[in-house]
């Protein structure tokens, strides 16, 4: 089967979040299963520097100017890029240094969808037409609308990685995007008087997926549906919406082979984990105390991610024999609050504002508990990395976190299903209760080791995920 993925980022070419990790793994898993898979992304400077030599596929005149589609192989996978310097030659992919969205994002990502639909329809004569176009998040959503507007035989799948980002733009931009005006309708692109690229994917795709079963249910409800819940209820009733959990790329995230950590380890040989903890403590200037419970957090600092729960209880938490390491960036208020906490507890808190892929591996390998207290979380990947590395996740019961982490309590520990710590209500008190339960279990070495072994035994490989998407594709092809 020929599959074309359309996305705005892909690891290791460019990454701002979990979408990139998915796009750096799912296409390879599908290719390994015997499919002919390719990916289309913009030709950002970071992509140009890492992709190497490319060949020209086509130069076309579009509503966004004359642009060139180029092609190269990335570790054996075919990747198309949109070479349009006037749109994509920028340091950051979505916003400027002041976190202000680029004013021409409507055009930049309409072009991504347009050329995705063109490629799926046979723009590359050497590759021909794809069986399935698979678009990811709002940046690629218009691809599904373009296919429908052309009455294309190509089938489309749209995956919601985060419904909180609807890709909303002023309605008058539709005149520039080579789409018919009749698409500006409640049964179409229209969303509260504007156009929504996310809604384009939800409405026009032949199938819609969310990145976990629980999230697929949550987004059909008003509280989590971001205004799209009515449409999603309709797609669910049609049998067109389902949840497919993300996986973990074993070639990137594997404590047995990870080159970004100081000591490799495996479930039956865990000495290396202690060495990684010591290295992490040294890196952040913390006392090398193997008995201190080391909490870690690798996150975007946004309201969604729940760092404010941690900050609200930081003084109480620091009264225990614990340490904390945080890697992340985002809200200036949250960054300031973390810096303030670190200045007050310099021997207990390590902080790095920013993102560092290699360091994130060392943090997850060296931690004892990874904090993912999100208010909502479509799938979440860091808790999966935590499980893989024996770093017990502490999560809120929402989205993919609910699907992947089992709370440690007396019964679940006894029947060997416990893999972490789960709290339900999104507030600082419930978060702190979960922290106290983690501290309590840490003091019981045999029970902690048992839960950690359960975590290490979890299987979230991409082969299973690829098979689920394959079955979905066969429903429509």
UniProtKB/Swiss-Prot annotation:
Keyword Glycosyltransferase: yes
Catalysed reactions, semicolon-separated: [(1->4)-alpha-D-glucosyl](n) + ADP-alpha-D-glucose = [(1->4)-alpha-D-glucosyl](n+1) + ADP + H(+)
GO MF terms, alphabetically ordered: alpha-1,4-glucan glucosyltransferase (ADP-glucose donor) activity; alpha-1,4-glucan glucosyltransferase (UDP-glucose donor) activity
Residues given in the record as ADP-alpha-D-glucose binding sites: 15
InterPro entries from the UniProt entry: Glyco_trans_1, GS/SS, Starch_synth_cat_dom
Gene3D superfamilies documented for this protein: Glycogen Phosphorylase B
Keyword 4Fe-4S part of the UniProt annotation: no
Protein keywords: Glycogen biosynthesis, Glycosyltransferase, Transferase
UniProt record, GO biological process: glycogen biosynthetic process
EC number: 2.4.1.21
Pathway terms, separated by semicolons: Glycan biosynthesis; glycogen biosynthesis
Uppermost EC category: transferase
Top-rank taxon, per record: Bacteria
GO cellular component labels: cytosol
Functional note: Synthesizes alpha-1,4-glucan chains using ADP-glucose.
PANTHER family recorded: ALPHA AMYLASE DOMAIN-CONTAINING PROTEIN, GRANULE-BOUND STARCH SYNTHASE 1, CHLOROPLASTIC/AMYLOPLASTIC
Family in the record: Belongs to the glycosyltransferase 1 family. Bacterial/plant glycogen synthase subfamily.
Name this polypeptide is given: Glycogen synthase
């Amino acid at each position: 089967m020929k599959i074309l993925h359309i996305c705005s980022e892909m690891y290791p070419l460019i990454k701002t979040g979990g979408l990139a990790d998915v796009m750096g793994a799912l296409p390879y898993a599908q290719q390994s299963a015997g499919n002919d898979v390719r990916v289309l992304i913009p030709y950002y400077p970071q992509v140009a520097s890492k992709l190497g030599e490319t060949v020209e596929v086509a130069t076309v005149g579009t509503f966004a100017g004359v642009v060139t589609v180029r092609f190269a192989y990335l570790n054996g996978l075919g990747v198309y890029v949109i070479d349009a310097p006037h749109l994509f030659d920028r340091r950051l992919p979505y916003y400027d240094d002041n976190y202000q969205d680029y004013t021409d994002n409507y055009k930049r990502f309409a072009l991504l969808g347009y050329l995705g639909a063109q490629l799926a329809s046979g723009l590359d004569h050497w590759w021909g037409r794809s069986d399935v176009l698979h678009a990811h998040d709002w940046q690629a959503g218009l691809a599904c609308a373009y296919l429908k507007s052309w009455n294309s035989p190509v089938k489309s799948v749209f995956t919601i990685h985060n419904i909180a980002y609807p890709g909303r733009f002023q309605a008058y931009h539709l005149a520039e995007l080579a789409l018919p005006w009749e698409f500006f309708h409640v049964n179409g692109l229209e969303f509260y008087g504007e156009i929504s690229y996310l809604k384009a994917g939800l409405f026009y795709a032949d199938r819609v997926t969310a990145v976990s079963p629980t999230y697929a249910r949550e987004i059909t409800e008003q509280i989590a549906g971001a205004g799209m819940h009515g449409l999603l209820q309709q797609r669910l009733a049609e049998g067109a919406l389902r949840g497919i959990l993300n996986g973990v790329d074993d070639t990137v995230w594997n404590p047995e082979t990870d080159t970004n950590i100081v000591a490799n380890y495996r479930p039956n040989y865990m000495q290396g984990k202690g060495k990684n903890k010591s290295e992490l403590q040294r890196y952040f200037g913390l006392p090398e105390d193997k008995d201190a419970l080391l909490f870690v957090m690798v996150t975007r600092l946004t309201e969604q991610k729940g760092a404010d729960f941690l900050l609200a209880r930081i003084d109480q938490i620091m009264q225990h024999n614990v340490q904390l390491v945080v890697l992340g960036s985002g809200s200036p208020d949250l960054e300031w609050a973390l810096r303030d906490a670190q200045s007050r507890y310099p021997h207990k808190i390590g902080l790095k504002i920013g993102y560092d892929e290699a360091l994130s591996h060392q943090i997850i390998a060296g931690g004892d508990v990874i904090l993912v207290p999100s208010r909502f979380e479509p799938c979440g990947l860091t808790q999966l990395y935590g499980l893989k590395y024996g770093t017990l996740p502490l999560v809120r019961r929402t989205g993919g976190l609910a699907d992947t982490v089992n709370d440690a309590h007396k019964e679940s520990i006894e029947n060997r299903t416990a893999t972490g710590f789960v709290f339900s209500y999104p507030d600082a008190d419930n978060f702190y209760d979960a922290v106290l339960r983690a501290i309590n279990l840490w003091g019981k070495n045999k029970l902690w080791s048992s839960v950690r072994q359960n975590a290490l035994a979890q299987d979230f490989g991409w082969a299973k995920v690829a098979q689920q998407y394959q079955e979905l594709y066969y429903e429509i092809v």
